[in-house]
């Protein structure tokens, strides 16, 4: 599969950003490619994306398990790497303010629930510690990806909701944070957690802050 992007694109910065936050068992980031596990609609596997600077394309390889949900993978990857961005429009808007850093993109996420978990785990700790904590949660609650040795699926809401708060606390987080993770997972199961951007962003952010363990800095 091939996706397109408009130059300039600072892939070194993007891979650096993702690499600093890479979760062991989920993501592998090198100078040349980004690879991770993904589960969707009962399917699971891994994918790898490799940018081609000369042709302004992103080459995507899916493991067999993800082929049935290829279209969903493409849409999520476009969002993760902000491929719909028009850098010229941004440059025209920012002018001199952005002239020194052309090609920056806004890193997205493959999954709103996963990003919610990672946001809660990232509270009041360094980027490196947030990645370590997430890796520990994945090791505790994630299941191996079939036919992809070394990779785990990000814990499902059901798996995280069923986790023992004290077992999560033992990974290196306050028990309140563990309870926040479980509450988030349960709200996804209940259908009360917004998995898509709300029509009113400000109202949506205020609503999220009413949830346990989520504040304005989350």
Predicted feature residues:
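HhH-family (HhH-GPD) DNA N-glycosylase catalytic core used in base-excision repair
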Residues: 1-218
């Amino acid at each position: 599969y091939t996706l397109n992007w408009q130059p300039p694109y600072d892939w070194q910065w993007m891979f650096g950003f993702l690499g600093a936050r890479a979760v062991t068992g989920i993501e592998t980031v090198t100078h040349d490619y980004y690879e991770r596990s993904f589960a969707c609609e009962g399917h699971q596997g891994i994918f790898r994306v490799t940018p081609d600077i000369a042709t302004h394309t992103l080459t995507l390889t899916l493991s067999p398990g993800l082929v049935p949900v290829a279209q969903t993978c493409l849409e999520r990857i476009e969002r993760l790497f902000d491929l719909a961005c028009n850098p010229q429009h941004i440059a025209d808007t920012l002018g001199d303010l952005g002239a020194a850093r052309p090609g920056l993109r806004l890193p997205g996420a493959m999954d709103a629930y996963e990003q919610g978990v990672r946001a809660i785990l990232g509270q009041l700790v360094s980027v490196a510690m947030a990645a370590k904590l997430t890796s520990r949660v994945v090791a505790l609650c994630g299941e191996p990806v079939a036919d992809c040795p070394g990779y785990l699926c990000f814990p499902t809401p059901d798996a995280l909701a069923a986790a023992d708060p004290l077992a999560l606390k033992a990974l290196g987080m306050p028990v309140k944070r563990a309870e926040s993770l479980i509450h988030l997972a349960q709200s996804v199961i209940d259908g009360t957690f917004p998995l898509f951007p709300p029509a009113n962003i400000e109202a949506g952010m205020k609503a999220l802050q009413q949830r346990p363990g989520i504040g304005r800095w989350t």
